[in-house]
Design a protein with these regions (language model features):
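Arg/Lys-rich, positively charged N-terminal/basic patches that mediate binding to nucleic acids
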Residues: 1-32
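Short basic (Lys/Arg) and small-residue
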Residues: 36
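A short, surface-exposed loop/turn module that caps and links secondary-structure elements
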Residues: 40-65
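Enriched for short, Lys/Arg-rich terminal
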Residues: 57, 64-92
Length: 92
């Protein structure tokens, strides 16, 4: 099980600049990913200031999401007590 679903999310978390992700979004997403990786229960994933974790409809395995800002979302799966396949998505 990999913590990140794609290279963009790995780059953002590790502080590598991406032209396709605004700097303010990258900083916020990195903080949120840190919370997801530290969580041991799904309830721990509530992001300070945003708070809501939503289960996405019709996904297998079950996928959850939380808003980073505006059109930017973090999606992830919850397996064996940890967030995996975390992905920063631009829905715009």
């Amino acid at each position: 099980m990999q913590p990140f679903a794609d290279e963009r999310t790995d780059d953002v978390f590790n502080g590598r600049h991406r032209k396709d992700v605004p700097e303010s979004i990258a900083r916020r997403a990195a903080r949120q990913i840190d919370i997801l990786l530290a969580a041991t229960k799904l309830e721990d994933c509530r992001i300070a200031g945003r708070g809501r974790i939503a289960k996405r409809q019709n996904t297998e395995p079950p996928t959850f999401c939380c808003n980073t800002e505006g059109r930017w979302w973090l999606t992830f799966e919850w397996q064996f007590g940890k967030a995996v396949n975390i992905k920063l998505e631009d829905t715009g």
